[in-house]
């Protein structure tokens, strides 16, 4: 019987299935960070248990770490306590951790693939919703809650029911000036933030195959913003080449065996999905969100929508609230919206290709006078090192951008990098909810190139014609 990629990954990890469909699923890789792990470790200790498989765990502090003056430590006492607690728990149980000043430290969803700790065919979980990122590598990856973190530590399994399957097929050559971020924002604009609810999404088609592995990670990262718990892409030669020489990747005969298995990780011809969405890449343009949800998104050459034209009462009310929070007026051209801050980073867009794309735009230019701060935050110490080797840091610094240490940074207001009330930010992150980047902060989601262009122009511009 023909199987989808999701079917194959799921079936390979079912340990036991109950009559109601509840399955015990084996977990291959468990990624830990400082925010959702303390209570899980505490529960483990109170029950007198040890981690079932220590080597399956990999930890890193990312949410709370400072991106400036790191040698001075963490100023906020709660943030410092969470990081110290992770350090202590990993030392206690012998779990590998990349500590704050380790070159390998970074955002958990960047360092997992970077190290080869995430591999095709794995089940990968983390106490973070954007774990879906790892599905770009042909893995079944999803976020879990703190109680589930404890359960995985103790048993290396989870109890759950299989989701429905959805295929989002994107065909055609990606237009000039458009990136993986524009692809996924365009998709969310079509299906909405609830479109994938209850489904595991496989992204497929010639456009997806044409993306780099890092671009595919950007797409799968935001599967959760489309309502799905997990997103995935079939394995191909790009995937396999990505893992050659990674520290945690198999070597020798084991590599050959692994590659043989990895090449089976695709949906079979004739496999049936519960829902199929077809997207024409020719319709994609550089995207900008205008509201307080990722589905409130438009092409950069569009205008802020007018709620009076919306017939649905609930949607109209949501639009009115979003416009009030964002301080925008209906029918305003998106290119007329000025920005106060620019953030290039996050688990969505902080990899080396993202920084290269932003640097191409920033080269030889200057951040606009009305932009109070433009910051670039690499996704890991190794990404930062590579960028500096290529001279990208100098391009950004000479243009007036701040060059920071790796971490989650301004993606969320859990560290020193945050917006002040009323500040408007062009951000390469994944969520534009009210207060996401700081109380009263106004977030517009864009690609790295679009963010860099906004920093230089002082307002949103169409990167396709920006000079």
UniProtKB/Swiss-Prot annotation:
GO terms for biological process: L-leucine biosynthetic process. [4Fe-4S] cluster binds at residues 347, 408, 411. It is an enzyme of class 4 (lyase). Heterodimer of LeuC and LeuD. It comes from Bordetella pertussis (strain Tohama I / ATCC BAA-589 / NCTC 13251). This is 3-isopropylmalate dehydratase large subunit. Its EC number is 4.2.1.33. Its cofactor is [4Fe-4S] cluster. It comes from the Bacteria. Belongs to the aconitase/IPM isomerase family. LeuC type 1 subfamily. InterPro entries: 3-IsopropMal_deHydase_lsu, Acnase/IPM_dHydase_lsu_aba_1/3, Acoase/IPM_deHydtase_lsu_aba, Aconitase_4Fe-4S_BS, Aconitase_4Fe-4S_dom, IPM_dehydratase_rel_enz, IPMI_cat. CDD domains: IPMI (cd01583). Catalyzes the isomerization between 2-isopropylmalate and 3-isopropylmalate, via the formation of 2-isopropylmaleate. Binds 1 [4Fe-4S] cluster per subunit. Keywords: 4Fe-4S, Amino-acid biosynthesis, Branched-chain amino acid biosynthesis, Iron, Iron-sulfur, Leucine biosynthesis, Lyase, Metal-binding. GO terms for molecular function: 3-isopropylmalate dehydratase activity; 4 iron, 4 sulfur cluster binding; metal ion binding. It catalyses: (2R,3S)-3-isopropylmalate = (2S)-2-isopropylmalate. It holds the Pfam family Aconitase. Pathway: Amino-acid biosynthesis; L-leucine biosynthesis; L-leucine from 3-methyl-2-oxobutanoate: step 2/4. PROSITE patterns: ACONITASE_1, ACONITASE_2. The keyword Protein biosynthesis does not apply.
């Amino acid at each position: 019987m023909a199987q989808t990629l999701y079917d194959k990954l799921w079936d390979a990890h079912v340990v036991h299935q109950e009559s109601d469909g509840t399955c015990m699923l084996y977990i291959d890789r468990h990624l830990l960070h400082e925010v959702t792990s303390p209570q899980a470790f505490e529960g483990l200790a109170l029950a007198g248990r040890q981690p079932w498989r220590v080597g399956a765990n990999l930890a890193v502090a990312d949410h709370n770490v400072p991106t400036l003056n790191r040698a001075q430590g963490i100023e906020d006492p709660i943030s410092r306590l969470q990081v110290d607690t992770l350090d202590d728990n990993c030392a206690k149980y012998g779990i590998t951790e990349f500590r704050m000043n380790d070159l390998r430290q970074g955002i958990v969803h960047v360092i997992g693939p970077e190290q080869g700790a995430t591999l095709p065919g794995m089940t990968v979980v983390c106490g973070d919703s954007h774990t879906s990122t790892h599905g770009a590598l042909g893995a079944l990856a999803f976020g879990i809650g703190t109680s589930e973190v404890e359960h995985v530590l103790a048993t290396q399994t989870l109890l759950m029911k299989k989701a429905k399957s959805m295929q989002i097929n994107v065909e055609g050559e990606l237009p000039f000036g458009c990136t993986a971020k524009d692809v996924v924002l365009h998709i969310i604009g079509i299906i909405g933030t609830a479109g994938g609810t209850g489904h595991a999404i496989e992204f497929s088609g010639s456009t997806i195959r044409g993306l780099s592995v890092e671009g595919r990670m950007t797409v799968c990262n935001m599967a959760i913003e489309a309502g799905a718990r997990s997103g995935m892409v079939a394995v191909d030669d790009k995937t396999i080449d990505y893992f050659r020489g990674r520290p945690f990747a198999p070597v020798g005969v084991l590599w050959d065996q692994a590659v043989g298995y990895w090449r089976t990780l695709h949906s079979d011809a004739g496999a049936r999905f519960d829902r199929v969405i077809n997207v024409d890449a020719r319709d994609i343009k550089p995207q900008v969100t205008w509201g307080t949800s990722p589905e409130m998104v438009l092409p950069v050459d569009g205008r802020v929508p007018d709620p009076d034209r919306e017939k649905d009462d609930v949607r109209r009310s949501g639009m009115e609230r979003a416009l009030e929070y964002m301080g925008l007026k209906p029918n305003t051209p998106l290119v007329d919206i000025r920005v106060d801050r620019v953030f290039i980073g996050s688990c969505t867009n902080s990899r080396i290709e993202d920084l290269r794309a932003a640097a191409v735009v920033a080269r030889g230019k200057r951040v606009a006078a009305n932009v109070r701060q433009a910051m670039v935050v690499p996704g890991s110490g190794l990404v930062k090192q590579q960028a500096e080797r290529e001279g990208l840091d100098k391009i950004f610094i000479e243009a007036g951008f701040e060059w920071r240490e790796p971490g989650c940074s301004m993606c969320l207001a859990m560290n020193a990098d945050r917006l002040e009330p009323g500040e408007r930010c062009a951000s390469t992150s994944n969520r534009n909810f009210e207060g996401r980047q700081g109380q009263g902060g106004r977030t517009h989601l864009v690609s790295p190139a679009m963010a860099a262009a906004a920093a230089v122009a002082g307002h949103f511009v169409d990167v396709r014609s920006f000079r």
